[in-house]
Design a protein with these regions (language model features):
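Amphipathic alpha-helical substructures
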Residues: 1-84, 145-159
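Sequence context surrounding c-type heme c attachment/ligation sites in exported
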Residues: 50, 67-68, 89-188
Length: 188
């Protein structure tokens, strides 16, 4: 998924935010274990988000078309209600890498530029926001924006540079494992 113009991302943005809210509602309303925030066997998505997830849905789990619903005029007039009603819990295959908060499209998108992934930003976010680890930028060091990977210089090469630099290694040893684990996903 590449969206250099940002049009598709702009259209999906409200759903990317709403996805986590709807996921939380399902866990709360169904009295599910909090462990589902870490790893769940389901996602809560709508039709536009399924363009990212690309799940093959059984007929009984087919996501509703808003126009098919009885009170469609009410729904079409209220954007927030329309978004909430269109989300559905969808069970995942056992082989799926999705499930839990960290694999949601909105969470993954937070730490990318929409064109390519950034294991450093993703790893730092998980280390700080989820695990509460302290990561301090060394004094007098500027962080450069990550350039798009090329055939001759990959993200792996950039990671190796940081790991081999003693100034960078202390933080990268904490955050890179998280960021690399999230490389199983594209920008979403």
């Amino acid at each position: 998924f590449r969206d250099r113009g940002g049009e598709k991302i702009a259209k999906l943005k409200p759903f990317l935010v709403q996805e986590s809210i709807e996921f939380f509602k399902v866990i709360l309303n169904e009295n599910l274990s909090l462990l589902n925030f870490i790893d769940s066997d389901f996602v809560v998505i709508n039709r536009p988000l399924n363009d990212i997830y690309k799940l093959e849905l059984p007929e009984e789990e087919e996501l509703p078309n808003i126009a098919d619903q009885k009170d469609s005029k009410l729904i079409l007039n209220d954007k927030k209600l329309r978004r909430q009603r269109a989300f559905r819990k969808v069970m995942l295959d056992k082989e799926s890498r999705r499930g839990g908060l960290l694999t949601q499209a909105g969470i993954l998108m937070m730490n990318t530029n929409g064109e390519f992934t950034n294991p450093f930003y993703r790893g730092a976010w998980v280390a700080q926001s989820i695990y509460g680890l302290e990561l301090e930028l060394p004094a007098n060091l500027e962080v450069e924006a990550l350039n798009a990977p090329t055939e001759t210089f990959t993200i792996k090469d950039t990671i190796n540079e940081h790991r081999n630099n003693p100034i960078c290694a202390s933080c990268h040893s904490k955050m890179d494992p998280f960021g690399l684990a999230m490389e199983n996903f594209d920008v979403f």
